[in-house]
Every structure is written in C-alpha cells, then in structure tokens.
Amino acid sequence: IAHDCNLACKYCFAEEGEYHGRRALMSYEVGKKALDFLIANSGSRRNLEVDFFGGEPLMNWQVVKDLVAYGREQEKIHNKNFRFTLTTNGVLVNDEVMEFCNKEMGNVVMSIDGRKEVHDHMRPFRKGAGSYDLVVPKFQKWAESRNQDKYYARGTFTHYNLDFSKDVLNLADLGFKQISVEPVVAPS
C-alpha cells in the first residue's frame, strides 16, 4: 500500500519502502483492482485476508480506509468475509487510527524491537533520531484498547542484539501480552 516509509530501519528489505524502485503510494484504483482480483480468483473460499503493509501503510491512510470500506461492500455482494490486518512502525498512529483499526482490522502488528537502545539503533528516523519514545506509548495504549488481544508487538532481532531474550522480556515488562519474534541478518 506504500512504497515509502518515515523510518530508516537498518535491516529493511524494502529499502525505506522503495523496494529498489521509487517512493510511491498505491492508488485507490490499484487497490480496488487487487481486491477485485482476489475475489474473482478465490473460488469457493469465503474467508479472504488482506494485510496492509509497506513501507509504512499509514502514510497512505485514506486509501487504507477506502479499501476497507470497498471490501466491506464487496463482502455482501460476493458472500465473502475479509479479514484485514495492518503492520505499522507506529510513527503515525493516533486515536483515529486506533479506533478504525480496532473496528475493522482483525489483527494489527506493531513493530518494536525491544529495549530502547536496540530499537533506536535499528529503527531510526532518516536523520538518525530514535523512534522508541514516540511509538512505545502509542503501542501500549493501542494494545490496551484491543484488550490485549488481536495484535502482536513484533520484534525484529539481529546480530546487534543476540541477547534478544532481554528484548522479549522488556516487551513483556512494558505490558505487551502478544509478542512475536522475527530474526533477520542485518548488514550493520
């Protein structure tokens, strides 16, 4: 949904959302065609899942909302059931995003890499400042608003934090009940 991002994560396979191309946001028309394609090729499958990710999907927030609305309309017409999910770095999360996602997203993935020093090292803004202090309070509020269910605080762990069990424990100490661990090899 977004070939763009507001962070410069050191291990990003999407090259700050560019995917080895140019920065761009998916149009509503392209997203609509993708949902139509999914419906047309789903056969007798009733349950369909769409994950909004990027880059950072909240950089294209209006299109996310519009595509969810379109998907909900199509459910009735085609006897389908969409399960929408969202993966975010949290920078643009606000009350409106939380409220909408709590209503419409079957799951949200909150990207946080554990302890402050690890997260800020691996997930900085483009100019180098850390993002931990901005995103952690939002993610804590969001997890509580989802009754500690149907979300994951997902840590991406690298050679930089081989003691990642400390990061998992830190996430638990922050109050997260749903924790996911994704290993990766980072260049630095």
Where in this protein do the model-derived segments appear?
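A short, flexible beta-alpha/helix-coil linker loop
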Residues: 15-20, 117, 186-188
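Canonical Radical SAM [4Fe-4S] cluster-binding loop centered on the CxxxCxxC motif
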Residues: 1-28
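Short, surface-exposed alpha-helical recognition segments that flank or form part
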Residues: 22-26, 58-59, 130
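Short acidic donor-binding/metal-coordinating loop in glycosyltransferase active sites
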Residues: 54-55
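Radical SAM/AdoMet-radical enzyme domain recognition
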Residues: 31, 35-51, 60-186
